[in-house]
Regions:
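N-terminal topogenic membrane-targeting module
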Residues: 1-70
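Cytosol-/stroma-facing membrane-proximal "stalk/adaptor" domains immediately downstream
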Residues: 67-130
Length: 130
């Protein structure tokens, strides 16, 4: 039996206004949101391959864990925020990878990394409003 990976929980409710903005989300934002909020099979962790490609996963035990997500409106744009527990990867490493994160999840988004709490990092992907 393949490993079962539970959906990542929303950490705050999505408002109707933000739901309305989903139509402006990029294909990648929509795909990431749908992938991490459903059961997955045969995967070690949510976004494990992505974190590896971004150089943020030295090994399985030190890989950051996607612990939650939420959707919001930033500057009038749809924004998907991924929340990671990152006890082994320092925040400055996340900041250093920000351009790579933006390129990986782009085009059509800007990426912002922020430290939410000790060892917690948020990656906000904001859709570029044309």
């Amino acid at each position: 039996r393949a490993a079962e990976l539970a959906p990542v929980p929303y950490t705050q409710p999505t408002t109707d206004a933000v739901v309305a903005l989903r139509e402006h989300a990029t294909q990648t934002q929509t795909q990431v949101r749908k992938d991490v909020t459903r059961y997955r099979y045969g995967q070690e962790a949510h976004l494990d391959e992505t974190l590896e490609r971004l150089g943020l996963s030295p090994n399985d035990t030190q890989r950051p864990v996607l612990s939650g997500l939420h959707e919001e409106q930033r500057d009038g744009a749809y924004t998907l925020v991924l929340e990671f527990d990152s006890p082994f990867i320092e925040f400055d490493k996340w900041q250093e990878k920000q351009p790579k994160i933006e390129a990986f999840f782009g085009p059509g988004i800007t990426a912002e990394v922020s430290q939410e709490a000790d060892k917690k990092v948020a990656v906000a992907m904001k859709a570029v409003v044309a």
